[in-house]
Every structure is written in structure tokens, then in C-alpha cells.
């Protein structure tokens, strides 16, 4: 795919007054007929992370806790709130422990790699 840089008409008049020139990028699609199917990008492909993974993001734990809350009855007792926050605290503590161990390992490798 060829890339061509062109000055737009708006930016041509503005570039005479300023020191920076603004460029717009245009692509020619002449090579699109010879594309291999390997290079074609599919927008329907999604990457999924299993929920049991220890490296899942905090947003997934929040969405999981909300889905648990929706499955429960509409009555919000103090024990369910306590249970929810204690499970979130345990999960966060486990993530912090894993992250701390990883950082310690990287620091150790950095120190011993220099000698």
C-alpha cells in the first residue's frame, strides 16, 4: 500500500504564517487486489480472556461482582455487601502479592545482570 503525503489547501495558507506544516496522509488502494488473505483484518475477531486467569483486569472483577449482585435477590442485606467487599479485597490482595513478587524478581535480575 503506497502512502502519499500531501499538503491540504487549508494548511498551505496556515503554513506560511507558522513554522510547522501540517500534512494529511492519503492511501492508494491499487495493491488491494493483490492482497493475501493473511493480511486482511477481520473486525469480528475478538480476544477473550478467561475469567479464572490471575492476570485479569480490575474492570472484569467489577463486572463479575455486578453480575453476581444481579443474580442475587433484590434485597441488599449487609452480609451480602460485606461478602462482596471481602472477596474484592482478597482478590486485590492476591493481585498485589503477585505484582510485588514480579517486581522483586525483575529487580533481582537487573542487579545480577550487570555483574
Curated annotation (Swiss-Prot):
Transmembrane spans: 44-63
Q: Which spans does this entry mark as compositional bias, Low complexity? A: 13-65
Q: Which Pfam families match?
A: DVL
Cellular component terms per the entry's GO annotation: plasma membrane
Membrane topology (UniProt): Single-pass membrane protein
From the UniProt entry, list the residue stretches annotated as the region Required for DVL/RTFL small polypeptide activity: 80-111
Q: Keywords of this protein's UniProt record, alphabetized?
A: Cell membrane, Developmental protein, Membrane, Transmembrane, Transmembrane helix
Quote the subcellular location field of this record. Answer: Cell membrane
User: Where are the annotated segments for Disordered?
Assistant: 1-89
| Biased segments, Basic and acidic residues type | 1-12
One biological process term in Gene Ontology? shoot system development
What is stated as this protein's family in its record? Belongs to the DVL/RTFL small polypeptides family.
Q: What is the role of the protein in this entry?
A: Small polypeptide acting as a regulatory molecule which coordinates cellular responses required for differentiation, growth and development, probably by restricting polar cell proliferation in lateral organs and coordinating socket cell recruitment and differentiation at trichome sites.
Q: What is this protein called?
A: Small polypeptide DEVIL 13
This chain's source organism reads Arabidopsis thaliana
